[in-house]
From Swiss-Prot:
Keywords: Plasmid, Plasmid partition. It comes from the Eukaryota. GO terms for biological process: plasmid partitioning. This is Trans-acting factor B. Plasmid partition require REP1, REP2, and a cis-acting DNA sequence (known as STB). REP1 may act by intercalating in the yeast nuclear matrix and binding STB either directly or via REP2.
């Protein structure tokens, strides 16, 4: 059945069903099929045949899934999907990222490997979102003054609203995030407690507000 359904397929010990929920799985397969079909028209002969074959393999999978599970209208439905991919918009973002990745690597990765990449990124994105939201809640709980609570909301929420899913952040962007946090807690008399609370969140606390990261200062990608 091709690379996607090999018996030895292993995405960090996740089953295929858990890797992506069935409707979303069909959507991602369909996206990859279209990406690879298009890419096969522009690649060297060495890769064009592989891209075309993967396209046809994936197409067969998503057509079977859509027929069997009556996949709904993707433009209207939201999906509460485990392991990090929470809705169709997220899937689109991930698929676009994968499409760029395909172009960059000239399709040296199989669809199987790209799905692993998607899964890993979705897990990391979910961790970012959970950490930032949890930390915001911690800050609000630490601050008793309603005016200070509003200050924290006003400073931080617009930043997070523009980056609901953080597939890739530069060190500069992470520095901005930490600076925003520092600005938000400034003059609230909870700086020490807030910094202590931050230690619970490894992705956030890894980056200091001056932009340094233990031994790293270059671009930080979710996929290492």
């Amino acid at each position: 059945m091709g690379a996607l359904y090999n018996e030895d397929y292993d995405a960090t010990d996740m089953t295929e069903t858990r890797l992506l929920a069935i409707p979303l799985q069909a959507y991602v397969y369909r996206t990859f099929s279209n990406v690879m079909r298009s890419a096969s028209e522009h690649l060297d002969d060495k890769y064009a045949q592989e891209a075309h074959e993967e396209s046809e393999t994936i197409r067969a999978h998503w057509e079977a899934l859509e027929t069997r599970y009556e996949v709904p209208d993707w433009s209207k439905e939201d999906f509460d999907v485990s392991e990090g991919i929470t809705n169709v918009d997220t899937a689109v973002r991930l698929a676009e990222s994968a499409e760029r990745f395909v172009r960059q690597t000239n399709l040296e990765l199989s669809a199987n490997q790209l799905l692993r990449l998607l899964h890993y990124r979705s897990m990391q994105e979910r961790q970012w979102e959970l950490e930032t939201r949890s930390y915001l809640n911690d800050l609000i709980n630490l601050v008793e003054d309603p005016a200070d609570q509003k200050r924290i909301d006003d400073v931080l929420m617009p930043w997070f609203a523009n980056k609901p899913f953080m597939v890739e952040l530069t060190t500069e962007e992470l520095t901005q995030l930490r600076k925003k946090i520092e600005d938000a807690i400034k003059n609230t008399n909870v700086q020490k407690s807030a910094r202590q609370a931050l230690k619970k969140y490894p992705l956030l606390s890894t980056f200091s507000s001056n932009g340094s990261r233990r031994g790293r200062s270059n671009k930080h990608r979710v996929v290492h």
